[in-house]
Amino acid sequence: SVITALFPDVYIDSEVVVGNNCYIASGVKLLGSVKIGNDCIIRENTVIGSDGLTTRRDENGKVVTIPQFGGVTIEDNVQIGALTVIGKGAIDDTVIHSGCRIDNCCFISHNVQLGEDTLVVGETIMFGSSSTGKQAFISGNSTVRDGVSIGEKALVGMGSVVVKPVPDGGIVKGNPAKQKE
């Protein structure tokens, strides 16, 4: 089947590639180099491929924005909730591997890598270059610091602020997130 359902007010840039049997709800924006696999669902008013805020200070202390040249790759059988933003990679792509589920109102920043079958629950923020292994579970309203990795089958408790790597199978909770005893 090659049926892909597009609803009103969807914007798709010319570089975007959408696979077969996808559902793209109203108000979705697909920007720049975005590749979407087969059997994906993208809910209302989600933005994929937007620039993130990557900055540095110059020698005079002025903020300088660093351009981003990557894209976003979304593999097969991924579901993305409403009002979610997935930023494009700085150089390489942000990648959402097959089977992932991202809830409503999440922010997935540049260069994030979500392992297969990972669940990210509502209002979670994953900052630049953070990652998960396969089958990780990030509970709602959690924050993952830039560059931090969450291991395979690891669990992040609700409202946690993850500032250090979480090992495979680890369970963390709190602010800052600590290993559950």
In which residue ranges do the predicted regions lie?
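Right-handed parallel beta-helix
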Residues: S1-G37, E44
